Amino acid sequence: MNFETVIGLEVHVELKTNSKIFSPAPAHFGEDPNANTNIIDWSFPGVLPVMNKGVIDYGIKAALALNMDIHQKMHFDRKNYFYPDNPKAYQISQFDEPIGYNGWIEIELEDGTTKKIRIERAHLEEDAGKNTHGSDGYSYVDLNRQGVPLIEIVSEADMRSPEEAYAYLTALKEIIQYTGISDVKMEEGSMRVDANISIRPYGQEEFGTKTELKNLNSFNFVRKGLAFEEKRQAEILRSGGQIRQETRRYDEATGETLLMRVKEGSADYRYFPEPDLPIFEIEDAWIEQVRNSLPAFPKERRAKYVGDYGLSDYDAKQLTATKAVSDFFEAALAAGGDAKAVSNWLQGDVAQYLNAEGKTISEIELTPENLTEMIALIADGTISSKIAKKVFVHLAKNGGSAKEYVQKAGLIQISDPAQLLPIIQQVFADNEKAINDYKGGNKNAAKSLIGQLMKATKGQANPQVAQKLLNEELEKL
């Protein structure tokens, strides 16, 4: 029997606010344990939550970016459970009226076609703290993360393969990153994924029993975990067994999923309206104000890059993978840069430099203006492509004017035959063997000579002019 896979994803996105959702404590990552806490986070008796308006702004922004309707009378609920990293014994979340609902995004499949994935809801909530189990037999609680604002984005069960789930996460991450509401860094926990998967015989409308894969910390592990779970569930059903509703985790070492616990239902959490927070009215003017702050998203930018600038689909995807690079590209074009040349540099030397340094484009000194200036120096023959690589590294580290650096460092390309001919003659005199080889019919000896010429000029000889002059001088031998 063949089975159809059914996948839905729950994505927790940490919102990039300065303070927490209900307390004034900082919401920054990487501080010493319990440094970013106050009495609200510790749930001292009598303290009350105070809503961070910026969190609602970000919630509206996410909902609009994901084509969602917005509950304009929004409230919070209590989700009751006990765990050491949750001192209140309940989490403030949203249950029946999330800030956003009935949304969708479009994903691109492997064959180049697109598919619309519906999004059921997006709700705001507070994050829990973090437990660390020490080798000394004690468990330690860090409440820095307690109260950090989250938005949980819950898809419909519209994905039919691990590859579709991967494509959905990639598209969702791009959109969220473009809004600026989160840095979506999975390695820092600001984007976390839970995956629900079931299988059913082809043609059956009713969903099968699902299992949940919890806290998957990379898109690749999401894909691998779902692929294993597809196979595991199919083997159980083919052998006459039944699937239990479980929460499982993906073991990165073995590539398998392992049982964590039997899954609870929403009734186990005894949701009820949060009595310490009012209903928040989100007026039309508020929504429009946020809508006007949204940037152009990747799909729109890619269409422009292909249609208006003549770039390939591949180039357009690479340039729009992050908003910072896309903004840099557009600023470079506004400064007079050639689209293809700027694209080539951003995908080539710039990308290699950023990877090697472990930095983003906003963390180096290169600017759209000085990159465009450098490309113009290549185009007009002032510097060679080889020298440009040296100029680029200087600009990335120090910034400033490309033209001024080239002049100050003496990197201007030598194109004057009167300057090059004496150097060529000296190269001939210093390389008698190559000259004799050339005279003997070995035309490859000319490659050695042009290499020696470039070395003698420290790479500053204009390659085209140098090659032409050298060939002419060789013909005279």
Swiss-Prot record:
It comes from the Bacteria. SUPFAM superfamilies: GatB/YqeY motif, Glutamine synthetase/guanido kinase. It catalyses: L-glutamyl-tRNA(Gln) + L-glutamine + ATP + H2O = L-glutaminyl-tRNA(Gln) + L-glutamate + ADP + phosphate + H(+); L-aspartyl-tRNA(Asn) + L-glutamine + ATP + H2O = L-asparaginyl-tRNA(Asn) + L-glutamate + ADP + phosphate + 2 H(+). InterPro entries: Asn/Gln-tRNA_amidoTrfase_suB/E, Asn/Gln-tRNA_Trfase_suB/E_cat, Asn/Gln_amidotransferase, Asn/Gln_tRNA_amidoTrase-B-like, GatB, GatB_C_1, GatB_Yqey_C_2, Gln-tRNA_amidoTrfase_suB_CS. One of its GO terms (molecular function) is glutaminyl-tRNA synthase (glutamine-hydrolyzing) activity. Keywords: ATP-binding, Ligase, Nucleotide-binding, Protein biosynthesis. Its EC number is 6.3.5.-. The keyword Iron does not apply. GO terms for biological process: glutaminyl-tRNAGln biosynthesis via transamidation; translation. The keyword Transmembrane helix does not apply. Heterotrimer of A, B and C subunits. NCBIfam families: gatB, PRK05477.1-1, PRK05477.1-2, PRK05477.1-4. Allows the formation of correctly charged Asn-tRNA(Asn) or Gln-tRNA(Gln) through the transamidation of misacylated Asp-tRNA(Asn) or Glu-tRNA(Gln) in organisms which lack either or both of asparaginyl-tRNA or glutaminyl-tRNA synthetases. The reaction takes place in the presence of glutamine and ATP through an activated phospho-Asp-tRNA(Asn) or phospho-Glu-tRNA(Gln). Belongs to the GatB/GatE family. GatB subfamily. This is Aspartyl/glutamyl-tRNA(Asn/Gln) amidotransferase subunit B. It comes from Streptococcus gordonii (strain Challis / ATCC 35105 / BCRC 15272 / CH1 / DL1 / V288). The gene is gatB.
